[in-house]
Amino acid sequence: LIEFAHESNTFTVKTTGIQDFQNSRYVRGAEMLEQLRGTGSEIGGAIEAAARMGWEVVPILAAHANPGGPVSEIARREITEEACRLLEEGGTLDGVFVALHGAMVTESDQDGESQFLREIRAEVGSEIPVAVTLDLHANVSDELAEHAQIAVSYRTYPHVDMAARAGEACDLLHRAMGREIKPSLLVDRPPMLVGCDDGRTTDDGPMCRILEAAAEEAQAPGLLHVSVNAGFTDSDVFAAGPSVLVCHDNAESAAAQTARRLCDLIWSFRNDWTLPMSLDEAIAKLKGHKLSSKPVVVADFSDNPGGGGYGDCTALLSALLEAGIENAALGALIDAKAAETLIEAGVGGVVTLWVGGKSDPSAGGGPLKLTGEVRAVSNGSLTFEGPMLAGVAADMGPSVCFRVAGVDVLITSNPLQMHDLNQFCSVGIDPMEKSVLVVKSMQHFRAAFEPIASEVLVVDAGGLCSPDVTRRHYERLRRPVFPLDQIDA
């Protein structure tokens, strides 16, 4: 069992180093089993499947970093070399399971997953079946299909089915190891950068209908599994955008026809995509909102650390304060220096300092000079308890609740998308007691926060992850693609 997972935003000024993996998850051998058994993660699902099928498990390593810039060459080499060394020590293997993201970019290769799988293949040989899991937002290259025989992508966004999809991949791997099947992968993609409404599955949108069609197609003789990926637009790589992956058993022609039909279906929904509201619209709605027993949840799509955003943009916080919004909480604003200063002041301390906006003031607002009271401090360690990644430990780093006027600001040291109520609770903020909850997240917040919300507002506050791809300059992306180019239907 191996995990090497990262979603890389190539438009950020930052890179992702080994410390970023250590801040999230970097464990080896038996520690993998101890930390991830029984969790809603891919490795957790694989461990459960292995027990069900009676495998002798050889845990290699689990390396996961929160989304950010391309993975540094130092980090890539360390993780890859460690994985290969442990594989060599693991002895004779019958199969390999690898939890990937699908949108990893390294400093030396725009296709980080294939780069890693090349090394794994060189270590284990060409005959052993390799099964991978992929995020629904994978940018799938043709090369990945050369190194893996089995690929299963998430079918939900928010991603609440990681463990289940890992189990599905392991079922196919078990059949391949027993020589019941000889799987192969085929990948196809429409000429699109944006598609599938970014993969949202919380309503009856394009992705739900495409996934239903994929499930029906997968019933054809010779086909083993069909995955659909919405792609990741914040990565300037050749294969960015939606794709279809078909796993088949000596049925290449049927697989190719299936993939093409699904690509045509994805293309037919090309104009069905949702853009968030402007900051001004959101503030106007908050001002006019009637009091309710449930909070209004405001999601800052554009400053989502889960998409590689900086998480320190201040435009939305500034607008809340200027509008005089009361009984609100905002999380998380990532500023390690501010957190350190506030922790030194201690609970009850009243402090004036510059907060946020330090990564790139041109993207979503520069530093804000704020005066407020330190309400709570924390080392940032917590365990997710909601529908997504339940049971998985997380580390926000030194964190504080800083009350500024009517807003409790969760300030953290490490980047972490808001998708679990416990992130607020860990610093004494009760989400149910607030009138307004602001979360830096695109879609994952919905799993835990939508059930407690009176209304959900999704906002583009000008951060790095703005969904308007026409603002960006793509250099590596294949062309022509929708919506950047005119393409005849």
Give the location of each predicted region.
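Active-site histidine-anchored catalytic micro-motif
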Residues: 4-7, 26, 69-80, 88-181, ...
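Short acidic, glycine/serine/threonine-rich loops at helix termini
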Residues: 11-15, 69-72, 108-110, 141-146, ...
